[in-house]
Amino acid sequence: MLSIIVPARNNAEFTATCLGSILFAVSRLNLNCEFVLVDDASAPEEKILDAFRQHRANAIGHQTKIVRSRKHQHYSGVFSIGLRFATRDIVFFISNDMLVTTSFIQSILLVSSLSRDFGIVRGTSNYTDSHPEHTVEPKEQLKTFQEIDNFSRSVFSANSCRYVEDKVLSGDAILLKRSLIERIGVLDLRFFGYFGDIDYGVRAHLAGFKLVCAKGAWLFHEGSGHVKHEMAHQALSFEEARDRRMAMVETAYQEFRKKWHLATPEIWGGGGSVEALHFFDRVRPRAKRMPLKYDFPPSAMDDLEIY
């Protein structure tokens, strides 16, 4: 029924904790899952493959595929690799700096089942990228997984299957239907680190699918986990890490402009969902001239090791 994609670039501790929370949640729901674990060229001393192998040993009754990229793929690459190897009808992608709960999985599966047009379903969190309207912060700091689980359950109890539609995709933890993947393929690999999800959301909209947020689904998000890890290990200041990130965002935006023939803005100013909404409105007239499906290029398999 469910394929679960978890990418990791370094930080085995975060990764193992994330995988443990997923395994606990799906086991409580008696779900048989296919795990697709993608090592994004992590340093050998980070022991990501060891964390993945330990998960395979723990995940009795589930199928686990382990894929390692020899080169850094970043967001669009690891997501697309995961989609290439996922085979189930429903696919869940999650960043490795998150903790999920049984209530979260229940909620996104429930909302996804409400309509065949719901191509992508996300949830809420204590920390959300580009979607401040989906941020739900606990009144007090949650110190244990039991407290996280209890808070998530309270959000589910209060909101059940309530949902709202989104115009822009920020894809840190999302559920996708196989029908969507068959229609628009994987993420466009011209977008290395950023704008891959925005482009994918645009293509989903243009293909007739809806992006929705399950308001009863809540997970814990550490936020920028791999960035914080690399800052610590590469002795980068916050300003240096921010400038490096924004340079990558600008490069990706210029690719987005080129793909969708956008004259303005000439420079991405760091914006967010508001600008992305404007992009969607402006690219809609180009839908008939633009291929919506992007297939995983066979040549990309050359960079991968399968375990």
PLM-predicted stretches and their roles:
Residues 2-18, 25, 38, 111:
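A conserved hydrophobic helix/loop-capping motif in glycosyltransferases and polysaccharide synthases
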Residues 91:
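Short aromatic/hydrophobic "clamp" motif used to bind/position activated sugar donors
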Residues 129, 202, 206-307:
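Active-site-adjacent helix/loop segment of glycosyltransferases
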Residues 153-176:
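A recurrent flexible, glycine/aromatic-enriched loop bordering the glycosyltransferase active site
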Residues 193-199:
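Acidic donor-binding loop at a coil-to-helix junction in glycosyltransferase catalytic cores
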